[in-house]
């Protein structure tokens, strides 16, 4: 960061009170003098002179800015001198005024990520056999065929777009149940990746940076979707071909288990 002190009283005596006058008097202190006379009288061998002392002075930011503006004006003037005023002169000038300090920042600000608004949509999912997902008991989803009279038993998911390893074919999402403090998560149970419904604090979830067990990579293949566990790659949200069986986490891609889903958007 840069810090700029104030001008000394001796220098202020030579400074013009007119805000439009950006220069010190030509007969001012030798340690800070800008010789800017009539350009026609400028010595062709000397050009525009700028004398700067390495001793630190007290300068307000406004006064330093005035000097910078003045130097910019001088640099842009067409002066018939052999040496043009270069940017290196400004760098030297700044090095005498400002002191560099490192500014450290974290790659990810966890607090900021938690406070960021999370984009979400509401949807229903059906497997490849058009079985709907319903809540059985408190913490279990099952897949079964529903008729028109009980279609309202389908769970509505709140699909949140979260931080993860995003690519062209994978979009990280979290799947919560609308109106409930429940999210699908993947954990290791009995040495096997397992899908479960996990209760969460509604004041903290959803958030942009979800724990990895809550994250699924949404993969779109033609008009179907797959949901791969971010915690356990190549393990997918799956249903059985048998009616009224629990939704589970499987790695039987291409086998008898169903991992393809269709999605129906639901208005909020």
From Swiss-Prot:
The record marks 170, 180, 189 as: Important for interaction with integrin. Pfam families: IL1, IL1_propep. One of its GO terms (cellular component) is cytosol. InterPro entries: IL-1_CS, IL-1_fam, IL-1_propep, IL1/FGF. Monomer. In its precursor form, weakly interacts with full-length MEFV; the mature cytokine does not interact at all. Interacts with integrins ITGAV:ITGBV and ITGA5:ITGB1; integrin-binding is required for IL1B signaling. Interacts with cargo receptor TMED10; the interaction is direct and is required for the secretion of IL1B mature form. Interacts with HSP90AB1; the interaction facilitates cargo translocation into the ERGIC. Interacts with HSP90B1; the interaction facilitates cargo translocation into the ERGIC. IL1B production occurs in 2 steps, each being controlled by different stimuli. First, inflammatory signals, such as LPS, stimulate the synthesis and promote the accumulation of cytosolic stores of pro-IL1B (priming). Then additional signals are required for inflammasome assembly, leading to CASP1 activation, pro-IL1B processing and eventually secretion of the active cytokine. IL1B processing and secretion are temporarily associated. Its main location: cytoplasm. This is Interleukin-1 beta. Gene3D superfamilies: 2.80.10.50. Keywords: Cytokine, Cytoplasm, Inflammatory response, Lysosome, Mitogen, Pyrogen, Secreted. GO terms for molecular function: cytokine activity; integrin binding; interleukin-1 receptor binding. Potent pro-inflammatory cytokine. Initially discovered as the major endogenous pyrogen, induces prostaglandin synthesis, neutrophil influx and activation, T-cell activation and cytokine production, B-cell activation and antibody production, and fibroblast proliferation and collagen production. Promotes Th17 differentiation of T-cells. Synergizes with IL12/interleukin-12 to induce IFNG synthesis from T-helper 1 (Th1) cells. Plays a role in angiogenesis by inducing VEGF production synergistically with TNF and IL6. It comes from the Eukaryota. GO terms for biological process: cellular response to lipopolysaccharide; cytokine-mediated signaling pathway; fever generation; immune response; positive regulation of cell division; positive regulation of immature T cell proliferation in thymus; positive regulation of T-helper 1 cell cytokine production; positive regulation of type II interferon production. The keyword Cytoplasm applies. SUPFAM superfamilies: Cytokine. The gene is IL1B. Belongs to the IL-1 family. Residues 1-116 form a propeptide. It is found in: Cytoplasm, Cytosol; Secreted; Lysosome; Secreted, Extracellular exosome.
């Amino acid at each position: 960061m840069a810090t700029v002190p104030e001008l000394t009283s001796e220098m202020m005596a030579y400074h013009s009170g007119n805000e439009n006058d950006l220069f010190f008097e030509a007969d001012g202190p030798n340690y800070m003098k800008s010789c800017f006379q009539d350009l026609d009288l400028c010595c062709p061998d000397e050009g525009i002179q700028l004398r700067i002392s390495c001793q630190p002075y007290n300068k307000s930011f406004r006064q330093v800015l005035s000097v910078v503006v003045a130097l910019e004006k001088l640099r842009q003037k067409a002066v018939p001198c052999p040496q043009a005023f270069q940017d290196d002169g400004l760098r030297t000038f700044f090095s005498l005024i400002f002191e560099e300090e490192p500014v450290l920042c974290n790659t990810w600000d966890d607090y900021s990520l938690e406070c960021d608004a999370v984009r979400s949509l509401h949807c229903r999912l059906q497997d490849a056999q058009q079985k709907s997902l319903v809540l059985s008991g408190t913490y279990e989803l099952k897949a079964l065929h529903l008729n028109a009279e009980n279609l309202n038993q389908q769970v509505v998911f709140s699909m949140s777009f979260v931080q993860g390893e995003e690519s062209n074919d994978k979009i990280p999402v979290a799947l919560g149940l609308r109106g409930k403090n429940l999210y699908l998560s993947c954990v290791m149970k009995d040495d096997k990746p397992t899908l479960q419904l996990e209760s969460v604090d509604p004041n903290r979830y959803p958030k942009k940076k979800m724990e990895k067990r809550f994250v699924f990579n949404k993969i779109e293949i033609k008009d179907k979707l797959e949901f791969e566990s971010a915690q356990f790659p190549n393990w997918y949200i799956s249903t059985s071909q048998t009616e009224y069986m629990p939704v589970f986490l499987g790695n039987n891609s291409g086998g008898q288990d169903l991992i393809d889903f269709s999605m129906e958007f639901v208005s909020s």
